């Protein structure tokens, strides 16, 4: 690691963390713009929130500006288009069930013909303001619920309309969009995952006329769904297992592993298994995102010294040299030194306390051995077909659930709650059957 990073990262990171997290005011001159795609399932979820959001905005931010793009950005993480679309459909179904969005029981991508018809309907409509938002939601609903008969009726009517004059509220553009997002004050907010962050910002700047009520079943960090002692015991007795595929150089790995260990694993008796991946280049990360996550999870962060390729390899060497029972604790210790003490573990004096604590005299495994183990983990992770890291695999009650990233950690508790509900329903059903006999 360069001396520049070793010496200046701890200083810079401490200063960054201690400064005020939020700018006092974001500019409102450009209002709020919502970027959508007709063939993006997250856009379908987003439009179901727009009328309610517009209703509580102050007049200075009205109307919401809508941009619909006909161009999809390349799928993330090298995923194929088909795999990415399938992932999005399944992920959106999970979000819809959690937050009570309207959503088809058997979701599928809308046809190209239907998308073209929806495009013309929106392009030719004379509707404005809230009436336009109602139409927008209806059109998306027809698209994503295969109500093609209704769509064709609107299409037949729209063909007879003249093209309306250009409207500041709505336009089509050909710009690459991966998934729906809001743009406000020079920042981007994912349309579903960052909606509450956006409304908190708007509320802070007194840009809402009333309190927002969105995503009513959202599970906050450090909030637990299961607090009843009997229910806790039932989940604990199922001995859930959680596999985590992480990049060693990523601060999100430290923040989430520490959070899951302290807040969830101990509470629910989750057996953790950590699988380090080859270097992913994630030492070049969004400092503001990591800082926000640290403060919301209450996990210690900074001063840090970002690991590079060499440091990640040394951490992996220590990890794989230990038995499975010691790997998790050793990795947490190394991550803690890196992300809360500003230690450079490629520098022997900084690494030595770890070697001493775990009685490691020499690092015996060769770089080739380590690379092979990391690559094996990477192959397994790739087979799970997830767009972001960390990738999480939860096994409980004979079922397996795969999800990813800081935006889906809440699923752990949601799954536990659903498992209990399923078991209680089954027990009630069995009891009814016994009574009938």
Q: Where do the protein language model's features map onto the residues?
A:
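Aromatic-acidic/polar surface patches that form glycan- and anion
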Residues: 39, 188, 308
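Structural alpha/beta surface segment adjacent to cysteine/selenocysteine redox centers
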Residues: 45-143, 254-341, 423, 427-436
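A eukaryotic "domain-start" boundary segment
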Residues: 11-13, 17, 22
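Active-site beta-loop-alpha junctions enriched in small/polar residues
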Residues: 39, 249, 277
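Asp/Glu-centered strand-loop micro-motifs enriched in Gly/Pro and often flanked by an aromatic residue
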Residues: 24-26
